[in-house]
Amino acid sequence: MNATNDSLSRTALYESHLKLGAKMVPFTGFEMPVSYAGLVEEHHSVRNACGIFDVSHMGEFRIQGPEALLLVQWITSNDASALDSGQVQYSCMPNGRGGIVDDLLVYCVSKEEYMLVVNASNRVKDFDWITSQNQWNATVVDESDDWSLIAVQGPHTAGLLQPFCDIPDLDKMKYYTFAPGNVFGHDALISATGYTGSGGFELYMRHDAAPSIWEGLLLAGATPCGLGARDTLRLEAGFCLYGNDIDETTSPIEAGLGWITKFQGDFVDCEHLKAQKEQGTERVLRGFKMLERGIPRQGYAIENSAGETIGRITSGTQSPSLGEGIAMGYINRSSATLGEHVAIRIRKNAIPATVVRPGFLPKK
């Protein structure tokens, strides 16, 4: 990673983005592409074909040693002991005060080696938290500056990538598994994961290999996509964004992440979260579909029929796939029944909306 004079870092693909005419913006300490040809076009390329994203700003930590699993189990809410080598798990790190330090991916390299992939904005905070909780003889190393990461997403991804990858039958690679391989002549870690809801892979490689792999993907027909499309894609899929839908004040139970909160063993905040799961919470994260024209945005009030505020939008957009406003937000449990009608306060107008589960696309 390179740093600029104004302290913004640049990924190994920075020059590639400029050549493609990307609109660059500051994002979590990096200069990152928000769009190339346009958000809507990029969004549809991922839903219908194959798009690529530079997500090298993400953080990667390596936890190793005979007691590595003990540390991973303690700091994360999911059950990492269920992972075999080559498997990935979505999880979160409770903060001991009812909230979330970060959500993350846990890669099981072996029972004595794990790679944690964390949000760029939380890299320093996460590393400090993990090391503060390391009461075992586990080695924790921040490898974030050593890796580039390209997300290759969409239904055509396996077919596009296969001629240039030495892993056979990519289309049969199970979701949330990974394997080392060679892509466009370079060593890489190929992970069947993503943040778009359209399938695909995430490729981890050393910085010097990133421009060549990126160029190879473009020549093979992939569309370059920016952070703008990444956000609309993840919101349509109902995926939480740290800092919007989850943070230090929201619990995984409130956020609908009970499915990654397992109680087989002890972990940070275990008893508190178990009580929440059994007794329920005062608010819950729900999805909202606008019934009339209007784009819901973060911070907008959610109101009942009496005009009382019963919640707040945490993420919202005009869905490129559906052509209507969609959002996620926290709402009082008493008003959170699926199918219930509420209103979103957009400027001076109360625009009707329906309460739905997060995840707005038809199931395929």
Where are these regions (language model features)?
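Acidic, proline/glycine-enriched N-terminal capping motif
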Residues: 1-91, 99-101, 228
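Conserved, structured C-terminal
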Residues: 1-28, 33-34, 40, 109-364
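Membrane-targeting and insertion segments and their boundary/processing signals
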Residues: 42-46, 97-100, 104, 184-191
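N-terminal glycine-rich flavin-associated loop
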Residues: 55-66, 107-115, 153
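Internal amphipathic helical hairpin motif
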Residues: 66-100, 157-186
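Well-ordered mid-protein domain cores that form the structural environment of catalytic cofactors
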Residues: 79-133
